[in-house]
Amino acid sequence: MKVGIIGAMEEEVTLLRDKIENRQTLSRAGCEIYTGQLNGIDVALLKSGIGKVSAAMGTTLLLEHCQPDIVINTGSAGGLASSLKVGDIVVSTEVRYHDADVTAFGYEPGQMAGCPAAFIADLKLIELAESCIKQLDLNAVRGLICSGDAFINGAAPLARIRTTFPSVAAVEMEAAAIGHVCYLFKTPFVVVRAISDVADQESHLSFDEFLVVAAKQSTLMIEAMLTSLAKRG
């Protein structure tokens, strides 16, 4: 089995990259893909860059060049579920765009024309993530993750997202694009991110302060998931 792992930022991939054995690097169009072995599993770790376009382009390169069997999106997210705090884990059941609007043509809010309203995460990967969460004794929420090309920082955008997507657990800037590409390639995926901030008027300050905490927690999760996959053979 080969596992594709995607993080947007240097801080979100550096801890994993440094542990990859027999590491090789592919640089293409602003993306970097690191291949090798981690915790007994063949991996291809993508640093995509921030935002939906970078994430979609990088995921396409990853799937075309490395052909992973599954994809895990790691990194940080802004928590919207009331029980989430910095360092907690959010696991996607589905991902949606919060900034797409073609409702004039009969589509749901967040649904891109010609596409499903949501991109559904793989149930077996969700269960794998949750078994690792239990093993590591972490606090976590399973739910909807919404993506858009904006850092959510303030009452108005937060209220809009919560009103439009009442079940949203977290927001960030890449997961829906990654899920979209995986859907087109028919590649199972899941998003497993750690909370770096609670999306409010001070979230930019929290993000800067706690990104490292979130990166450590999400890395811990990825390593646990890889170890579990290796044991399963």
Curated annotation (Swiss-Prot):
GO CC list: cytosol
Main EC class the enzyme belongs to: hydrolase
Positions bound to substrate: 78, 152, 173-174
Pathway(s) the chain acts in: Amino-acid biosynthesis; L-methionine biosynthesis via salvage pathway; S-methyl-5-thio-alpha-D-ribose 1-phosphate from S-methyl-5'-thioadenosine (hydrolase route): step 1/2
Lineage: superkingdom: Bacteria
Lineage: Bacteria, Pseudomonadati, Pseudomonadota, Gammaproteobacteria, Enterobacterales
Keyword Amino-acid biosynthesis: yes
Summary of the function given for this chain in its UniProt record: Catalyzes the irreversible cleavage of the glycosidic bond in both 5'-methylthioadenosine (MTA) and S-adenosylhomocysteine (SAH/AdoHcy) to adenine and the corresponding thioribose, 5'-methylthioribose and S-ribosylhomocysteine, respectively. Also cleaves 5'-deoxyadenosine, a toxic by-product of radical S-adenosylmethionine (SAM) enzymes, into 5-deoxyribose and adenine. Thus, is required for in vivo function of the radical SAM enzymes biotin synthase and lipoic acid synthase, that are inhibited by 5'-deoxyadenosine accumulation.
Subunit (UniProt): Homodimer.
GO MF assignments: adenosylhomocysteine nucleosidase activity; methylthioadenosine nucleosidase activity
InterPro entries, per database record: MTA_SAH_Nsdase, Nucleoside_phosphorylase_d, Nucleoside_phosphorylase_sf
Family: Belongs to the PNP/UDP phosphorylase family. MtnN subfamily.
Protein name in UniProt: 5'-methylthioadenosine/S-adenosylhomocysteine nucleosidase
Signal peptide (residue range): none
